[in-house]
């Protein structure tokens, strides 16, 4: 059988004569391999329709044009092979239309003033910050082979999962597809009883906090229950160690009140993930080894107030704090597993992490390990001012889209030392909801790169 494929080649030259020479040389090379350059016909037309949505057909074999002609159809159109410039084109300056070449690998290679690889994308809803972050992630995934892990509390990337098919993995925490007990400390640490015990102690302590009970955690009782369970496992009374068995069958003998109270959580739609049965199996979803990996949540947490005990959503927030502790373990495993190659970890809706107890620590942990584990953290938020100083001090690059808050605009201009530039201030004012606004005004971004340059 024959394999059919189509290549679309763009040649670059500063002069028409040189362009013609290169095209003739290329044509000769193709013909020597029995490959003829032809007009688009038949199957090629459908290919062109997919590549160029507006159906631009070419009447000549060679078209003389500029870079922007190609990039306006598809972000891949702005790419080319060669080392004349470094990086990939992500956008164009306004005004001027000068292509912006971007290489997120440079900080890790010591080729920039800052060695911090983290990037922050800021802007209002609809300003394009998520699209820009995903553009960066997908470009580097496709052309550099970087694996991507995205943690998205709002869960609006499912179309991308369907598009990528077998090249993507999706862990939707709390969904019906998640088996009960997938976060059970004994299932997650099957070969390390000591680590499993330590995690079980922390989990039970956190569960008492979830319930809001004024009960001191009896760690000694948990330890006794643990060793009793190990004996049952060695004697083959049970074939699997679980937190459920530890609490319901063993801890109840030493601390009945704690055991009975904690077991009431086993029926909660989310907390069931911490309670395995003898039939539960370690969830394969933790093997996030695809080019693109996504973690979402079936249920979004409410924003926690400063006084969590007075919050009517205290239970949900406390549960979500426990989930974040498990998410941190998943992210750490992903980063360490691929530490010999560059990876990207995307945190969308940063404010959710900030407002959920333990959430910001997850982000901070990734940012601090980024250089050591060759990771590029992407943080997406509506407010740069919401990011803690500890994290912001480890950010190397910032993209700022349109903003509604004048206070936030002033904070960013002060952070970037651009307070005396009224034109920049005007460009950041939100136009996403303006009637008849042009694309150029709607999706403008202020960029500060790894070398502290602004555009």
What is each model feature region?
Residues 168-171, 390-402:
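A short helix-turn-beta junction within AAA+ P-loop NTPase domains corresponding to the substrate/partner-engaging
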Residues 152-153, 348, 375, 380-386, ...:
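Conserved H-loop
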Residues 416-434:
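Phosphate/diphosphate-binding loops
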Residues 35, 46-100, 155, 159-167, ...:
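P-loop NTPase motor domains
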Residues 1-69:
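Extended, folded cores of ATP/NTP-driven motor/assembly subunits in large transport
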Residues 86-173:
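Glycine-rich phosphate-binding loop of nucleotide-binding enzymes
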Residues 148, 344, 378:
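Hydrophobic "anchor" residues on beta-strands that sit immediately upstream
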Residues 159-165, 386-394:
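Short regulatory helix/loop adjacent to the ATP-binding pocket of P-loop NTPases
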């Amino acid at each position: 059988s024959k394999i059919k494929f189509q290549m679309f080649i763009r040649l670059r030259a500063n002069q028409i004569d040189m362009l013609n020479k290169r095209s003739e040389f290329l044509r000769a090379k193709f013909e020597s391999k029995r490959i003829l350059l032809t007009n688009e016909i038949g199957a090629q037309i459908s290919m062109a329709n997919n590549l160029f949505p507006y159906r631009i057909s070419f009447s000549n074999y060679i078209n003389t044009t500029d870079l922007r002609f190609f990039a306006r159809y598809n972000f891949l159109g702005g790419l080319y092979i060669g080392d004349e410039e470094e990086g990939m084109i992500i956008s164009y300056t306004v005004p001027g239309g000068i292509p912006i070449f971007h290489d997120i690998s440079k900080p890790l290679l010591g080729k920039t003033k800052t060695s911090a690889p983290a990037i922050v994308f800021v802007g209002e809803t609809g300003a394009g910050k998520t699209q820009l972050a995903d553009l960066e992630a997908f470009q580097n995934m496709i052309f550099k082979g970087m694996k991507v892990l995205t943690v998205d509390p709002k869960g609006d990337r499912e179309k991308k999962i369907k598009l990528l098919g077998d090249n993507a993995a999706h862990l939707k925490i709390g969904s019906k597809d998640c088996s009960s007990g997938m976060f059970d400390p004994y299932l997650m640490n099957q070969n390390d009883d000591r680590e499993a015990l330590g995690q079980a102690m922390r989990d039970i302590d956190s569960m008492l906090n979830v319930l809001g009970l004024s009960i001191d955690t009896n760690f000694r009782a948990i330890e006794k229950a643990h060793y009793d369970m190990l004996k049952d496992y060695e004697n083959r009374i049970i074939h699997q160690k679980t937190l459920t068995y530890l609490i319901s069958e063993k801890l109840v003998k030493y601390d009945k009140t704690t055991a009975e109270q904690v077991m009431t959580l086993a029926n909660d739609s989310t907390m069931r993930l911490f309670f395995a049965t003898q039939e539960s199996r370690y969830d394969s979803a933790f093997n996030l080894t695809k080019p693109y990996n996504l973690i979402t949540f079936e249920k979004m947490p409410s924003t926690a107030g400063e006084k969590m005990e007075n919050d009517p959503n205290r239970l949900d927030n406390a549960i979500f704090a426990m989930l974040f502790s498990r998410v941190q373990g998943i992210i750490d495993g992903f980063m360490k597993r691929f530490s010999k190659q560059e990876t990207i970890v995307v945190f969308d809706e940063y404010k959710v992490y900030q407002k959920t107890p333990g959430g910001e620590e997850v982000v901070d942990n990734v940012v601090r390990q980024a250089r050591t584990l060759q990771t590029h953290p992407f943080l997406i938020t509506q407010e740069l001012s919401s990011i803690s100083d500890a994290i912001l001090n480890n950010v190397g690059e910032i993209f700022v889209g349109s903003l509604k808050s004048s206070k936030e605009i002033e904070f960013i201009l002060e952070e970037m030392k651009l307070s005396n530039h009224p034109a920049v201030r005007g460009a950041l004012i939100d136009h996403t909801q303006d009637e008849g606004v042009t694309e150029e005004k709607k999706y403008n971004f202020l960029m500060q790169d790894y070398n502290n340059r602004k555009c």
